Amino acid sequence: MIYQVVLLLLVSPAPVSAAGCNPDCTGIQCGWPRCPGGQNPVMDKCVSCCPFCPPKSAQG
């Protein structure tokens, strides 16, 4: 019974973090993009480990 409780404690945080995003971007080297229209790059580790230009629908 104790092993089941410990296993649940170890496994339960995994789905929570996987559903949110994956912030583990260690060892990845990124550049800084130049976005069209003077937009600032977006930093969202739930989408990408590297900064990226916002979609055109978000620019207007």
Curated annotation (Swiss-Prot):
PTM description: Contains 4 disulfide bonds.
Signal peptide location: 1-19
Entry's localization field: Secreted
Record bears the keyword Transit peptide: no
Keywords, in A-Z order: Disulfide bond, Ion channel impairing toxin, Neurotoxin, Potassium channel impairing toxin, Secreted, Signal, Toxin, Voltage-gated potassium channel impairing toxin, Voltage-gated sodium channel impairing toxin
MF annotations from Gene Ontology: potassium channel regulator activity; sodium channel regulator activity; toxin activity
Tissues with expression: Expressed by the venom gland.
Keyword rRNA-binding: no
Function per UniProt: Insect-specific toxin. Blocks voltage-gated potassium and sodium channels.
Protein name: Insect toxin mu-NPTX-Nc1a
Organism expressing this protein natively: Trichonephila clavata
